[in-house]
Amino acid sequence: MLTTGKKEFWFVVGSQHLYGEETLAEVRAHAQAMTDALNESAVLPYPLVLQDLAVNADKITSIMKEVNYRDEVAGVITWMHTFSPAKMWIRGTKLLQKPLLHLATQFNESIPWPTIDMDFMNLNQSAHGDREYGFINARLKKQNKVVVGYWERPEVQQQIAEWMDVAVAYNESFNIKVARFGDNMRNVAVTEGDKIEAQIQFGWTVDYFGIGDLVQYVNAVTDEEINRLFAEYADLYEFDYGTYSREDWEKSVKVQASYEIAIKRFLDDGGYNAFTTNFEDLYGMKQLPGLAVQRLMAQGYGFAGEGDWKTAALDRLLKVMSRNQSTGFMEDYTYELAAGQESILQSHMLEVDPSLASNKPKIIVSPLGIGDREDPARLVFDGKAGDGVVVSMADFGTHYKLLINEVSAFEPTVPAPNLPVARVLWEVKPNFQDGVKAWLENGGGHHTVVSLFLTTDQMITYAKLVDLEYVVIK
C-alpha cells in the first residue's frame, strides 16, 4: 500500500502536585502499566507512547507544542488519573493542532469496598477529574473524542483503535495531492467544487495536467517493464480471452500495464497520492485507463472518474483511515425494484476497486462505447458482502457537505455473463425508499466512496475535526 510513514500517539495522564510525590509515583506506575497493556493488546493499530505526567500548565503546554511539530505523532490520548485542575490545560489544549481523545476510565475496574480509604479516593478519582477536564474541552470547542469505559475491555480498546485510524487520516488529509489528467466531464454538476476552500478546510492540493504530460511518461515505459508487470498479472488474476485472439488480448492488456507504470511514476515523481481521469481527455492515449487504475487503487492511491477530484481525495482519505481495507471509489448505476429485494447496483465504466472483490478477479478486454478509443482491459469481479458506509462530498456554494449512508452489501447470486465490468450490490439503510429519498433530498452525488471497514461514527469524528457539515442516513 501507498504508506503514510510510521505514526504514534502520545498518552498524557493528568494529575497535580497537590497529592505529593508518593501518589504521583503510583500514577506513573499505573500509567505505564496501562500503556504497556494497551500496546500488547494487538487491538490498537498504532503504538501508544507515555509522556511525562501532566501536573502543571508549563508541562502540558510543552507536550502539546511538541506534538504539533513532530510529524510522526498523529494525536493525543488523555486520561485523568486524579483531579487535574483544568486551567492548567487551557493554553496547551488551545495550541494543540492534532486530534485529541479523552479516555474516561480508571486504573481499577471496581471499588474495593472492604479496604477503600481516603488515600485510595485521592489516587483514583477519575470521575472527578473527567468532569473538570471535560468542561474545559467543551468550553474551548475542541471537538475532541470521548471514549468511556474500563480500559481493558475489548470494546473500549476498539473505540480507541477506530479513533486512531481517523486521527491518522486527518493528519494525512493535509498531505493529499490530487493530479487531474484532463478536466471535469463536460456539463456534469456534482463533480465541480471550490479547490481553494478544499485546501483551506481539508488540506487537499489539486493540480491540473494536460493529458500530454502523462503521454510522455507512457511513451517512456520499456517493453521489459511491461512484460515484467504482465507476468505479475498472470500470477494474480484469471485471464479471460473472450472472443479476442490471445495476441490481440495480450496487446490490449499490455497497454494498460504501460499505463499503470506511467501513472504511478508520474504520481510518485510529483508527490501525488490521488488522481482523476476523463474519457473526454484522451488525446494521444490508445485506451481509457481501466485495469491500470484498478491496480493503483488497490495499492492505496485515491481515484475518481470524470475529473471528480473531490471524490478522488476522499477515496485516498478513507483508504488511509481504513488501512486500505474494503474501501474504494464507487458509482450508483441501476436500481433493483422487485418487492422485498430493493437494492442498488454499483459499478463504473471500468474502474471498480478490487479491494472490494469477493472472488478472484479476471482480466477481460471489451469495447467501451465512450471515449472513441481501443477496447480497454479491466478487472471483473463480484463485490463482497458486509455492513459499511457510503460517503459523498459535494460543494453547495456556501459550504461543503458530507453525506453518510449506512449500507449492507451482499454478494450477487445471479450471474451476469454479458456485464463486462465489476459489480457491487447493496441495500441502503434504513430502507430503500427512505434511504434513497434522503440521499436525493440532501444532494448526495452519484460518485461515492464505500467502505465495508469504516463506521458512521468514524465519519462523524472526521467531519467534526474539519468543521464539515454532515448528514447521516441510517
Swiss-Prot record:
Its EC number is 5.3.1.4. Keywords: Arabinose catabolism, Carbohydrate metabolism, Isomerase, Manganese, Metal-binding. Pathway: Carbohydrate degradation; L-arabinose degradation via L-ribulose; D-xylulose 5-phosphate from L-arabinose (bacterial route): step 1/3. Pfam families: AraA_central, AraA_N, Arabinose_Iso_C. Disulfide bonds: none annotated. Binds 1 Mn(2+) ion per subunit. InterPro entries: Ara_Isoase_C (IPR024664), AraA_central (IPR055390), AraA_N (IPR055389), AraA_N_sf (IPR038583), Fuc/Ara_isomerase_C (IPR004216), Fucose_isomerase_N/cen_sf (IPR009015), Lara_isomerase (IPR003762). It catalyses: beta-L-arabinopyranose = L-ribulose. Its cofactor is Mn(2+). The keyword tRNA processing does not apply. GO terms for cellular component: cytosol. Mn(2+) binds at E306, E331, H348, H447. One of its GO terms (molecular function) is L-arabinose isomerase activity. GO terms for biological process: L-arabinose catabolic process to xylulose 5-phosphate. Belongs to the arabinose isomerase family. HAMAP family: Arabinose_Isome. Catalyzes the conversion of L-arabinose to L-ribulose. This is L-arabinose isomerase 2.
